[in-house]
Amino acid sequence: MFDLDSLIRPNVRVMKPYSSARDEFQGEARVMLDANENSLGSAGPAEFNRYPDPHQRAVKQALAQLKGVAPEQVFLSNGSDEVIDLLVRLLARPGQDSILSTPPTFGMYEVAAALNDVALECVELAADYQLSDEGIARLIASKAKIVFLCSPNNPTGNLLRPAAIEQVLRGFAGLVVVDEAYGDFADQPSWITRLAEFENLVVLQTFSKAWGLAGIRLGMAFASPAVIAYLNRIKMPYNVSENTQRLALAALADTGRFEAMRQELLQGRETLQAALAELPIVDHIFPSDANFLLTRFVPDAGAVYRHLLERGIVVRRPSQAACAGTLRLTVGAAVENDALVAALREFEVAG
């Protein structure tokens, strides 16, 4: 049975969230002399002399309305990497506890475990990059504090089967974190819609992919108010900058632009997949619910990778054993996709 309070590290249970004098003031202050800021303004071109809202209230309100949740169910972070690290720190005691990962998958779960001196238990995905019945049973039986499930998965691109995730949610005693960094490209409802059913569910999303805002570093976590309240206890006071909050609000006010880009990338994925399928050096293109295509090349993916680099085309070469012989190809703008395909055809001719 899931019991959040018993999972939280004892030292965190007694912590209180950061509070400033401005939290005690209601309304709009006429004179602010509490935080030792520079009241004369900024040395740069814009007015950033005041600290940002540490609670990111305006952004959370806009996101809550967009996602259909309460603002108290939203946590914002300096990229998803920060909230992954915070979740590990929230529950797992250094040198004592463990977390779960399902490779091949996003590498930051392993990094967060190592940084926090927490053991990493790995339950490998099956050959089709799905959770097997045996894998699900191992996850449920584990005494780990957290299981991270990346869906759509990076670097494989596929959604994990919803029934498998639901089994883990119903059986695992710790937090189940579903990382939906690429969820906007998938034809499936977000797990945010299931938060009311599962108090042990945390859903991660990001502004870095479909929103096209990787440079502002803004991640999102959606969970029960209780989980979010604990995260607020341990985050740094001003973890999301004023500039990031302004840019996020501007993006959230123009969801039409977001949807247009999303549709263009989905069409680009389809077009790129069709072009790759015609190339003899392409052995297999794995099904993708993301903005990239994991592609197996023959006879030598490494040679293809080096050929592309020599022509100024940078793709990702997965390092995990289950992805041997593959390259991860991001769906770019049409001109970038065309350049990629042309370079691959050139490799065939040269070979």
Q: Regions from the language model: what does each represent?
A:
Residues 1-58, 62-65:
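N-terminal "arm"/small-domain region of PLP-dependent enzymes with the aminotransferase-like
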Residues 56-98, 116:
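Phosphate-binding glycine-rich loop
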Residues 90-112, 124-126:
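Conserved PLP-anchoring active-site segment centered on the Schiff-base-forming lysine
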Residues 103, 119-127, 205, 318-319:
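Short beta->alpha connector loops at strand-helix junctions that form conserved
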Residues 114, 131-142, 155-176, 180-213:
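Active-site pre-lysine segment of PLP-dependent enzymes
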Residues 163, 307-311, 316, 320-351:
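PLP-dependent enzyme catalytic core of the Aspartate aminotransferase-like
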Residues 200-278, 284-285:
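PLP-dependent aminotransferase class I/II
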Residues 265-266, 278-311, 327:
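Conserved PLP-binding catalytic core of the aspartate aminotransferase-like
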